[in-house]
From Swiss-Prot:
HAMAP family hit by this protein: GTP_cyclohydrol_B (MF_01527_B)
Keywords: Hydrolase
Name of the encoding gene: folE2
Annotated InterPro entries: GTP_cyclohydrolase_FolE2, GTP_cyclohydrolase_FolE2/MptA
Biological process annotations from GO: tetrahydrofolate biosynthetic process
UniProt similarity note: Belongs to the GTP cyclohydrolase IV family.
Function: Converts GTP to 7,8-dihydroneopterin triphosphate.
Listed name of the protein: GTP cyclohydrolase FolE2
Enzyme class: hydrolase
Native species: Thermotoga maritima (strain ATCC 43589 / DSM 3109 / JCM 10099 / NBRC 100826 / MSB8)
Pathways per UniProt: Cofactor biosynthesis; 7,8-dihydroneopterin triphosphate biosynthesis; 7,8-dihydroneopterin triphosphate from GTP: step 1/1
Catalytic reaction equation(s): GTP + H2O = 7,8-dihydroneopterin 3'-triphosphate + formate + H(+)
Amino acid sequence: MKDVQNEKDPRMVPLKKVGIKDLHWPLKVILKEDGYQSTVAQISCSVDLHREKRGIHMSRFIEVLNKLEVITPQIFEEILDDLIEIMEAKRAHLEIHFPYFIWKESPVSRKKSPLKVDCFVEAEKEKNFSFKIGVRTPVHTLCPCSKEISDYGAHNQRAFVEITVKTRKFIWFEDLVEIAEKNASSPLYTLLKRPDEKFVTEKAYENPRFVEDVARDVALELEKDPRITWYRVYVESMESIHNHNAFACVEKGDFVLEG
């Protein structure tokens, strides 16, 4: 059977990335407490294409991905190595996004409910292996300016803290979620009874935060974590009294700690 993809391309233009995206795939995530959580990931993967080759065999991505069942750094490097070999490439890239549920107790009534966070993993292999993990955690922020100038209350809203890290040691998704929540005005909960609502509302009022505050405090905590070699923090607030959102962003190398 004729192999069209392997035909020599006369244009001689190399391509940096060729691949597939938005592939939905079942997989398991290791829980910090113990066991696994099943989820459905959205996957994108690619390789570079030599200037003399017309195309790649897309089906080979799926064949290689068949070994992806549980998320570990080791399996990602294996997949990238396999892609480089089977595609005769120099570089391979793999990115997955998936929902992850953390069971939380409400602060007063102790009612349990799941909180959805969005997790992602990005891996790349050329000469060296690069591996990033991250979470996008929903939190609660209350505006310090609004509190200061108002006789009653202050505007507050849901916000999202996105943390991306490179690490020298394994780090749990739950650890990153905890860092995001502790530096906001208040965590979010799926289930709140009236005493819980009172607690969360008052906690946020006593702990006002701009997106700038959240981004800086999260960055300082990541900066001091010996497991983390690089990080990026992005905070976005779904402003309740404005027709726009507010955001702040910082990554390792943007500042130097003094003292």
